[in-house]
Amino acid sequence: MTATETGTAVRRARIERRTRESDIVIDLDLDGTGQVDVDTGVPFFDHMLTALGSHASFDLTVRTKGDVEIEAHHTVEDTAIALGQALGQALGDKKGIRRFGDAFIPMDETLAHAAVDVSGRPYCVHTGEPDHLQHTTIAGNSVPYHTVINRHVFESLAMNARIALHVRVLYGRDPHHITEAQYKAVARALRQAVEPDPRVSGVPSTKGVL
């Protein structure tokens, strides 16, 4: 988070993360309008991150070059880590935010729920996915996305943003719908949690710090 000349907080972050497995640049603006531009080399993951940024009303640009010739795992995991880092950085001292958010998202036969506490204490609980998502691949005609990584995405996001994140699937059948409903539920919960609260000027904690 940076500040303008007038002292108004600008809740933006840029993260550059490079390893032998991936090269990532993320630009995030929490006070955006849902303008999203994502290219990770994994088309279904692009689709999920586009949904997340759009439904959170974040302006989000993601550029990832990963070793997808091996598999998508490193690319997806590392991008989720960097996105969590960007979220944590953009939140700054967390003054004036609502802190908590939750959302139920239906997608046809599926219903998912997410709850967020921007607590500074990283934790993730992920429950309810049907067993068949442990071995489902969503591929189209390009680099496949293995739905077994869904939990890892949410864990990586939560740990690196330093938030408590609970995600659950109440019911569902189609792997695409189940996965997308979860991403959208997380997006809507984050949108609520990071929104400015007009009734709060300081840090929303009795401890005075998050």
UniProtKB/Swiss-Prot annotation:
Disulfide bonds: none annotated. Belongs to the imidazoleglycerol-phosphate dehydratase family. Its EC number is 4.2.1.19. The keyword Amino-acid biosynthesis applies. PROSITE patterns: IGP_DEHYDRATASE_1, IGP_DEHYDRATASE_2. One of its GO terms (cellular component) is cytoplasm. This is Imidazoleglycerol-phosphate dehydratase. Pathway: Amino-acid biosynthesis; L-histidine biosynthesis; L-histidine from 5-phospho-alpha-D-ribose 1-diphosphate: step 6/9. Pfam families: IGPD. One of its GO terms (biological process) is L-histidine biosynthetic process. It catalyses: D-erythro-1-(imidazol-4-yl)glycerol 3-phosphate = 3-(imidazol-4-yl)-2-oxopropyl phosphate + H2O. Signal peptide: none annotated. Keywords: Amino-acid biosynthesis, Cytoplasm, Histidine biosynthesis, Lyase. It comes from Mycobacterium marinum (strain ATCC BAA-535 / M). PANTHER family: IMIDAZOLEGLYCEROL-PHOSPHATE DEHYDRATASE, IMIDAZOLEGLYCEROL-PHOSPHATE DEHYDRATASE HIS7. SUPFAM superfamilies: Ribosomal protein S5 domain 2-like. GO terms for molecular function: imidazoleglycerol-phosphate dehydratase activity. Its main location: cytoplasm. It is found in: Cytoplasm.
